[in-house]
Swiss-Prot record:
Gene Ontology terms describing biological process: tRNA methylation; tRNA wobble uridine modification
CDD domains, sorted: trmE, TrmE_N
Phylogenetic placement of the source organism: Bacteria, Pseudomonadati, Spirochaetota, Spirochaetia, Leptospirales
Keywords associated with the record: Cytoplasm, GTP-binding, Hydrolase, Magnesium, Metal-binding, Nucleotide-binding, Potassium, tRNA processing
Organism: Leptospira interrogans serogroup Icterohaemorrhagiae serovar Lai (strain 56601)
Positions with a binding annotation for GTP: 230-235, 249-255, 274-277
Catalytic activity, EC: 3.6.-.-
Protein name per UniProt: tRNA modification GTPase MnmE
Amino acid sequence: MNDTIAAVSTSSGAGAIGIIRMSGPEALTISSSFLFSKNKFLSPSEILPRTAIQCVFQIGDRKIDQILFFYFKSPNSYTGEDLCEFHFHGNPILLREALDAIFRAGARPAKQGEFSRRAFLNEKLDLTEVEAIGRLISARSRFELELAQKNVFGEVTRFTSNLRSQLISLKAECEAEIDFSTEDLTYESLEERKTRIENVKSLCQTLISKSSSAEKLIQQFRIVLYGEPNTGKSSLMNVLLGKERSIISEIPGTTRDYISEEILLEGIPVRLVDTAGVRETTDHIEKLGIERSEKEFQSADIRLFLVDVSKKENWKEFINKSRERLEGSILIANKIDILNSSWDRNLFSDVKDLIVLEISCKTKEGISNLLDAIKERTGKLGHSEDYVLLEERQRYHFETIVRCLDKTLHLLKEGAPAEIYIQEINYALAEIGEVNGKVDTEEVLGRIFSKFCVGK
């Protein structure tokens, strides 16, 4: 990292501000050759760190733009190197001309992600924080953004630090037992050691579980609206979207294929799917639509089964026919503003895991209760404090740690000596190092010497 890199760090296209960032040993020297103020170019000694300097970016005799310039002296910068920022007016042609001049002065084009790579290599960030920055930039919902923010501010880093500390303490105990077996020292019992390992394993499993739940929410819950024609599926779709997305008609079979649309529910992207009405038909195209409706319904995360309570009479027959589909669904009794006297929600009391809600798409009655039920089904929807987000690479390493600890427990139960099962603890520690890019085996010695009197 002896060279100096530069790149435009704002998004492409025109904007109010365009920023060029430069990092490396020659960043300040190169910068000073373009900073013109009070009829002269500024010398490096005149540029104070962490101070906004208003000046002209000038190439030779040619004034390019009135800019703000910032200098961050190593190691107190994002990359840990000397880092400079030029804040231009955001014209891409202007930025290109300035950047080309910076390259001619000795900097080279930065590679993709190279500023963050240098931050990692200079220990300004660990790998989990680098990955969190990428997630922060690409987040598609408030929920994902909040989870990325937690990782940027060290959520996974703190977890791995705690995990590592516990495993090093465990390893120190085991190594002391091996190396100082002739000393008159008291060690923890096997049961105590098993409990410690189980606790560490449980921490990892909880983390993985929270991440899996978070990933499910980020990847979109699919909520499928299902039922016979004219039960109000398309009307409910429009109500939930807050706009006319599905065609509404009294003619059965209007919706021939499923229609899907994304909404944000408590900051989480949810995919709503309006399906074709299910009925007996000879129309080939409508049959294909109904087949797709069935597939969508079966694969849904949340199933909204709509019925028209203003028309249906024989509810017991309906329950017997639809029981399998009703189980685990939310039954939406629509059109309660024109309720038929035959309707009785208690008829559904023996259907397993069924929520019955009464609504009117026309008057909006019961819609808030439906939204609450959806949130309940998704499990504390939108509360990012209940979740942790792991990248696929991180999850793999934590799952490997769990396997190492499982094997450690197995060896302990089989009566294996510490010399054998300590290797699995070593493997687990190596995996933690892979998570955040830090491995330091010397720390184990420090733990041993601080705990036991060995200096004879």
